Amino acid sequence: MKKDIHPDYRPVVFLDTTTGYKFLSGSTKSTKETVEFEGETYPLIRVEISSDSHPFYTGRQKFTQADGRVDRFNKKYGLKDANTAQ
């Protein structure tokens, strides 16, 4: 294997800017900001969305029904779906 071709993988703190939630993970992303977390100093990476603020993980996700071409055709000509009739 070639030497010195892999980026530096190290522990970093990710900060969700919408909620203020911090978590420690490994990353190769470089940053000049640092933060004290659990008694240690780590590089800080700011993110807009994390598991603490994403609607899927918080339970605030809304599902919308996207009608496809077949559904529109059936609706237009008054046909019923064979799968839902049973």
UniProtKB/Swiss-Prot annotation:
Keywords: Ribonucleoprotein, Ribosomal protein. GO terms for molecular function: structural constituent of ribosome. One of its GO terms (cellular component) is ribosome. Coiled coil: none annotated. GO terms for biological process: translation. NCBIfam families: L31 (TIGR00105), PRK01678.1 (NF002462). Part of the 50S ribosomal subunit. Belongs to the bacterial ribosomal protein bL31 family. Type B subfamily. HAMAP family: Ribosomal_bL31_2. This is Large ribosomal subunit protein bL31B. It comes from Streptococcus agalactiae serotype Ia (strain ATCC 27591 / A909 / CDC SS700). The gene is rpmE2.
